[in-house]
A protein has these predicted regions:
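Gram-positive cell-envelope targeting signals
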Residues: 1-66
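N-terminal maturation segment of proteins
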Residues: 48-622
């Protein structure tokens, strides 16, 4: 599926009472990233076994291959991996490439990919073969960029194989990160580059009932295996589906399609009319019935879930949680190490905030009545685009960003704002969605927009794309890197807003503490076995009400490890920055550090750290 980078408003009231209308808006857990191949749950292990070309001499061994030939072979290998991945389904292809001809990709039949145990097993088989193919290359003969790709792919393929005994724990549905929640936006933003794209889109709509049926069958099997979701989670998804299809004749996807078709150049009036009529028939005849069927299935399965608490309540739940955290964050830290790290960060942030408030009581009151320089999203983005130039590497001013607003039927299930990753060959054109729901205070959205735009997701994605990386990097998704950077950018936003520095520091530490509390709650519920009462007791000491604790508990049960990429990803980047600053001393230049992190692109943090040590050595030796 398309790559939706999403973000929750994390500005949580910390130890202080707020007005009632401000209390609940901070607690809705939203997904991290739906990666570019989310339709089939995973990365770098779809269809197609790679055969490595070895030249004309069939007796060549790795040692006999020249450096040049090895590099050429590796380039062909990763190019084939990229092509296989993006052609796995039509949504992935449409969201990844505007122009398919340079990759010799022919028009393919409409496809949503596949789901279910058999599809996952096939994916593991491909992972195993790709890993074997990867390891045939003589590492020392690769270029530095190829070595980086090799290291990332090898690590991720091995991680994929670790899921072989955990496939039944996979969850395609989710209140915010589930396919049923993401699909409307993915369809709405499906790119109509050509008339063929319109035709493919309409064919995709017909495939949704069968696709959802496979998910329903998967959920039925989970029910039989004692792994079905909690009633609370099921009901939330049911309510979400009902809201989306509540106005079938005036559905969001009908309105969006009509608008796009009317703007599409080159169609006759008859073609426009025909397309509009066909789309309406298919939305009402295929999409809405698919959501109705999913709703009916979930309703029938309610009550069959045997575990109302976190993942550790299942036989292999703790192991699956460890796997989720590792794959989502890109961090090699154990759960115990992460838990200890969170305790330390909460203590440090609390101590720092207490000192600021004690030394300067007015700072606290000022922080409670912040007025940002802009509350209009477009004006905020324009301001941030200019403001980042001091501390962040230069990016072309030709980058565009279209600000759109979430349809009312989707407001309850989507975050305050989110960024849509553009095609790799069309990265200059970006889209950010703003949720106009009454529960979100858009006057306080400044740092959220910093997370999504500059210096956050939009800037990070466009800067990396501007370095002309290998296309295969676009299908490698490390949530911890992208959301860690987004959180880093959000915190930086306090300083870009022109606030008093002490106020900015207080707000920054408050957000860090809040994120750490969410991550602690996640570990507590899903790994340590906290029930609601234990979580409530823990959060109460930080000023959370019972109602707020209930919302957090339900969120952690519904979507385990969702907060970890934001929190742990940020902490990893902050530690890298601290390490670089300490080692370089007076030679540390913030803009150069940012350039290093952005240029290396999404990667596991141990790989980034290894490259950073070399970068530091290079700076010192100059």
């Amino acid at each position: 599926m398309g790559n939706i980078v999403k973000k929750e408003d994390y500005r949580y009231p910390y130890r202080q009472k707020r007005e009632k209308e401000n209390k609940t808006k901070h607690f809705k857990v939203l997904c991290t990233i739906v990666c570019v191949i989310a339709l089939v749950s995973g990365i770098l292990y779809q269809k197609g076994i790679i055969v490595i070309p070895t030249g004309n001499n069939k007796t060549d061994t790795r040692e006999e291959r020249s450096t040049e030939d090895t590099q050429e072979d590796f380039s062909r290998f990763i190019q084939q991996v990229f092509v296989d991945e993006v052609t796995d389904n039509s949504i992935t292809l449409n969201y990844t490439l505007k122009n398919k001809s340079p990759y010799e990709i022919e028009e393919t039949e409409a496809s949503l990919g596949d789901v279910g145990i058999d599809a996952m097993r096939e994916s593991l088989f491909v992972s195993e073969n790709r890993l074997a193919s990867l390891e045939t290359f003589e590492y020392k003969k690769l270029t530095d960029e190829q070595k980086l790709i090799y290291d990332i792919m090898k690590k991720m393929l091995k991680q994929n194989l670790e899921s072989s005994e955990l496939l039944e724990y996979t969850e395609y549905l989710g209140v915010t990160s589930g396919i049923q929640a993401q699909l409307p936006i993915l369809l709405a933003e499906y790119n109509f580059y050509s008339k063929e794209d319109i035709d493919t889109y309409l064919e995709l709509l017909k495939l949704i009932p069968d696709y959802f049926m496979k998910i329903e069958n998967f959920e039925r099997q989970k029910s039989k295996d004692g792994l079905f979701m909690s009633d609370t989670t099921a009901q939330a998804i049911i309510d979400q589906c009902k809201e989306f299809i509540s106005h079938s004749s005036d559905n969001y996807l009908i309105k969006v399609f009509d608008n796009k078709i009317n703007k599409f150049k080159g169609l006759s009036e008859e073609e426009v009319s025909s397309y509009i009529d066909t789309n309406k028939k298919e939305i009402t005849g295929y999409v809405i019935p698919a959501y109705e069927s999913l709703t009916d299935t979930l309703t029938s399965l309610k009550g069959t879930g045997v575990n109302p608490n976190g993942l550790c309540g299942y036989k292999k739940g703790k192991k699956y949680y460890e796997y989720l955290v590792k794959t989502k964050t890109g961090s090699d830290h154990s759960i115990k190490e992460i838990n200890d790290m969170l305790d330390k960060k909460i203590k440090q942030a609390s101590k720092y905030m207490s000192k600021i408030i004690t030394d300067s009581p007015d700072i606290y009151y000022e922080s409670q009545n912040i007025k940002y320089p802009y509350d209009d999203p477009k004006e905020t983005i324009n301001h941030l685009q200019k403001a980042v130039k001091k501390d962040f590497p230069e990016l072309s001013d030709n980058i565009s960003c279209d600000v759109k607003y979430v349809d009312k039927s989707l407001q309850d299930s989507l975050s305050p704002a989110f960024y849509l990753t553009p095609a790799v060959d069309n990265y200059e054109n970006n889209v950010i969605y703003i949720n106009n729901s009454a529960k979100y205070d858009l006057s306080k959205i400044f740092t959220t927009i910093a997370h999504e735009s500059y210096p956050g997701h939009l800037y990070q994605n466009c800067y990396f794309a501007s370095t002309n990386p290998s296309p295969v990097r676009s299908i490698i998704n490390i949530d911890g890197y992208t959301e860690g950077w987004g959180t880093y950018a959000e915190l930086y936003g306090y300083y870009l807003a022109g606030l008093d520095r002490k106020v900015a520091e207080l707000l920054e530490k408050n957000t860090i503490a809040t994120l750490c509390l969410y991550a602690k709650s996640d570990i507590g519920v899903n790994y340590l076995g906290w029930d609601y009462k234990k979580l409530e007791k823990y959060l109460n000491q930080y000023g959370f009400s019972a109602a707020q604790s209930r919302i957090i508990f339900d969120s952690m049960v519904a979507e385990p490890a969702s907060y970890m990429p934001y929190t742990l990803g940020y902490l990893e980047i902050a530690d890298l920055k601290k390490d670089a600053s300490e080692k370089l001393g007076s030679d540390f230049i913030l803009k150069d550090f940012h350039k290093f992190i952005l240029s290396i692109g999404p990667a596991p943090f141990d790989i980034i750290e290894e490259r950073m040590d070399k970068w530091i050595d290079g700076v010192i030796s100059k």
